[in-house]
Curated annotation (Swiss-Prot):
Protein name: Bis(5'-nucleosyl)-tetraphosphatase, symmetrical
Keywords, in A-Z order: Hydrolase
CDD domains in the record: MPP_ApaH
One Gene Ontology term of the molecular function aspect: bis(5'-nucleosyl)-tetraphosphatase (symmetrical) activity
Organism: Legionella pneumophila subsp. pneumophila (strain Philadelphia 1 / ATCC 33152 / DSM 7513)
Top-rank taxon, per record: Bacteria
Family listed: Belongs to the Ap4A hydrolase family.
Function recorded in the entry: Hydrolyzes diadenosine 5',5'''-P1,P4-tetraphosphate to yield ADP.
One Pfam family, short name: Metallophos
HAMAP family for the chain: ApaH
Protein EC: 3.6.1.41
Catalytic activity: P(1),P(4)-bis(5'-adenosyl) tetraphosphate + H2O = 2 ADP + 2 H(+)
This protein's record includes keyword Lyase: no
Transmembrane regions: none
Amino acid sequence: MPDYAIGDVQGCYDPLQRLLELIDFNEKEDCLWFVGDLVNRGPDSLAVLRFIYSLPVKPKITLGNHDLHLLGLLFGGQPWKGHDDTLEEVMLADDGEELGHWLRKQSLLCRSSELNIVMCHAGIAPLWDLSKAMDLANELEAVLSGDSYHEFFAQMYGNKPDIWSDDLVGLDRLRVITNYFTRMRYCDAHGRLDLGYKGTLSKAPNHLYPWFEVPCRKEIEMDIVFGHWAALMGRSSHPRIHAIDTGCLWGGQLTALRLQDRQRFSVPGYGVSRFE
């Protein structure tokens, strides 16, 4: 009964099915861990959601920024972002709201002591140890799954605050927690988020670091599995930090990481790379 962490699917239903065939997935025994961004940009977000929702073994899911965007559209009155969105089919589906309520009750962080794994969409803020990250994930999850979710989704967007402080309260506190867990790529040497630059490591401004290389980063005693960052193409500088967004939608692959032995499996995705 292996566990597999799956990279950013982003509505790519056919590659997901090919990947599951490659790993000889047994839906009655195996457990899938989805790193987030189940939806958007790809052609089949509704099919992806329906498939994952129907799995007999409950999957572990950490929410990504595109998942939160869908929830903002469904429940927060957020406007369409533009031509890149491919969420209309979900919005118009008879079961779209039901799927949305299921999605908003998923996690920001999943962990397994047995597998020595912690998973989140974008990463763990350099300023947090694992205990802090777990507490803050629980805090935000309580809002997403609780009665005040409409208010949060209506106001979740924004790049400020851009650094964690224990003194933060209210929406500012929830927004920075959200941005670290779901949007983070680069930080400065003090752990301050930079949400502007999204390019390759080789062209990054000198003052920015990948979140997992920030000099002040607190050590996490478990292996970290994350997605979100297709430009890394599955590579990180740390042997215990596993990047599994391999650009399925951008000329890359869709990747599964078997958590028992950290072996990778990949199938071709769609499109032409925008990172060349």
